[in-house]
Amino acid sequence: MVKYHSNCLKQDFKIQSYAPVIYVGKDAIAKGKVGAVLLAGGMGTRLGSDKPKGVFDIGITRHVYIFERLIENLMDVVNETGSYVHLFVMTSEKNNTDTIEFFKEKNYFGYPCDYIHFFVQDMAPASDYEGRFLMESKSRIATSPNGNGGWYLSLKKAGYDKIIAGAGIEWLNVFAVDNVLQRIADPCFVGATISNNCVCGSKVIRKVNKDEKVGVLCLEDNHPSIVEYYELTDEMKNAVNEKGEPAYNFGVILNYLFKTEELDRIAAMKLPPHVVEKKIACIDADGNEVNPEEPNGYKYETLILDMIKLLDSCLAYEVVREKEFAPIKNKTGVDSVESARELLKKNGIEL
């Protein structure tokens, strides 16, 4: 049974009790117990670019790249704690070479290259509506990235679990490439998760309205669970809690903190595949290239939300939307380059 998550820790640095929590987080980071994982396998197609999304320039009067903004956010924590954080960057087959070359070209934006580790996301075959493999060429099956739930298995496959164990990393902060305001390896978030004896934490924002297209952190059979926005029923959208507030109101922003020993446990399990209808480039029976304008088959993905369901606890950690949520999914309009620029400027970041 799914029910709303009734407890949420709200980030408010004016509260005196936050000082010990921040100390716990800073101490863990300073001792090298926290690593970060950047999910950066996407391309900038919807932004009008054929390059990796992270290389997109959002600057106005100067060059400001998405990757650069994220490294700057991470450097804020390095300066606070005096300790570099290992950053594991998940790329895809399509953008791996371009991503690595871009980081080298920009001298890793001043971050020590020994602390940045690239690995490629695993791929999954695509099929037509009858379940038959689509072909990319006469000798190659059409494939696509296997979803954001496959990140830890791909990291292990690259051998980086040995770096994690050797460095004594106990927590991994996983975050998406397209939110240029988020704090990474955030001491308060880390400290709050540890202090509340949770094995996972999720940064959440309060939804602007019941129809906002974000997944919602809930409880399902007393386990943490994320319900995607398209799965929310009208009853759930209109439900209120004991205070008369919207009940299903904690929107996730794909910024999670996982205890590494829990990740090892989950890695031994099989996450369910999600079938997603997509436009898939392929060849037809005569070997001619097909670039469909409408969906023509299925991709198969695993999702982080299914990892969350396998955990006993997940702290809902509310952040201030205007200070930590500037997603770049479109070129204009909602969640766009334009809207992100405005939020960055409001936070004093020169563009």
Which stretches of residues belong to each language-model region?
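Structural beta-sheet core signal
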Residues: 36-38, 89, 118, 174, ...
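Generic domain-boundary/flexible-linker signal
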Residues: 47-48, 98, 129, 183, ...
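Catalytic core of tubulin tyrosine ligase-like
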Residues: 168-173, 181-185, 190-350
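Active-site-adjacent bridging/hinge elements
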Residues: 37-49, 128, 233-234, 275-278
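Conserved beta-loop-beta/alpha segment of the NTase-like Rossmann-fold superfamily
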Residues: 108-109, 113-213
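N-terminal glycine-rich phosphate-binding loop and ensuing alpha1 helix
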Residues: 1-116, 135-152, 160-161, 303-305, ...
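An acidic- and aromatic-residue-enriched active-site/binding cleft used to recognize and process polar
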Residues: 39-43, 52, 60, 92-95, ...
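A broad, structure-centric signal for solvent-exposed, well-ordered loop/edge residues
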Residues: 54, 62-65, 126, 265, ...
